[in-house]
Every structure is written in structure tokens, then in C-alpha cells.
């Protein structure tokens, strides 16, 4: 399971002209689900995403996680993160989970975030989405479990 996380000052996702999720300061989480992923991996990734210390403390050091910084989370499904790009000029998606499995694990990940009392907003799984963000600094990390 893969999360591309970006520290943002604001972010939103729109589907068919409707805003489905919007946050102020916090994390935009682009989530990719691979074939061998399961709930255990989703739990570990959620723990890492919410605990990752990429927000500045009073001394300007990256020492706070999103909860400590008072931020929110916007989770957007992105199957292209599971692409195999090692060769050729076209990505292969053979490493990606089936749509049903990916949606179930995406929903599970979102619910785990909410159980941690995070303000968690979402896109719409498998929809054609427009994602807007203001990347803070920029700060972007690839987390994989």
C-alpha cells in the first residue's frame, strides 16, 4: 500500500463539478492499493501517515505530526501509484489490486483515519476527479508498507 503525502495549506477534490472533500492546513494523501495489500498494511500505513512528523514545531523543526499541528487529512484514491514503470513507455498496472479490493481497502483506510479522531475528507473512489492543492514548502513524501 502506497501513500504519497503532501503537506498543504489547503486542498480540495471535485467530482462532476461538486466539491466532495476540502481541507485547510494538513495532508493531502494520494492512496494506491496493490495486489498483496490487506487490512494489516492499511493499519500500518494509516499509523505512519498520521504519525509522520512533517509539520514545524515552535523552533521550526519538522517535529509535529498532522494531529499535533491541528491539521486535517484529504484522502484521494490514485491507482496509478501502483504502476510498474521500470521499462517501456507505457505503465503497467499489473501490481494494482482489483477495483473491488482496492475500494474496500481505501474505505478501510479512511475509516481508520476517522477512528483516530482526524477530520478526514475524501474524494470519490474510481471517479474522474480534479484535485486542487497549495503545497506547503513543498513537502512531499512517498510512504509504502
UniProtKB/Swiss-Prot annotation:
CDD domains: Dtyr_deacylase
Keywords: Cytoplasm, Hydrolase, RNA-binding, tRNA-binding
Family, as annotated: Belongs to the DTD family.
Catalytic activity: glycyl-tRNA(Ala) + H2O = tRNA(Ala) + glycine + H(+); a D-aminoacyl-tRNA + H2O = a tRNA + a D-alpha-amino acid + H(+)
Species the sequence originates in: Shigella flexneri serotype 5b (strain 8401)
Quaternary structure (record): Homodimer.
Pfam family, one: Tyr_Deacylase
Gene3D superfamilies: D-tyrosyl-tRNA(Tyr) deacylase
SUPFAM superfamilies: DTD-like (SSF69500)
One Gene Ontology CC term in the entry: cytoplasm
Matches recorded under PANTHER family: D-AMINOACYL-TRNA DEACYLASE 1, D-TYROSYL-TRNA TYR DEACYLASE
Enzyme Commission no: 3.1.1.96
Swiss-Prot/TrEMBL GO biological process terms: D-amino acid catabolic process
Protein's name in the database: Probable D-aminoacyl-tRNA deacylase
GO MF: D-tyrosyl-tRNA(Tyr) deacylase activity; Gly-tRNA(Ala) deacylase activity; Ser(Gly)-tRNA(Ala) hydrolase activity; tRNA binding
Subcellular location(s) of the protein: Cytoplasm
Coiled-coil residues: none
InterPro entries documented for this protein: Daa-tRNA_deacyls_DTD (IPR003732), DTD-like_sf (IPR023509)
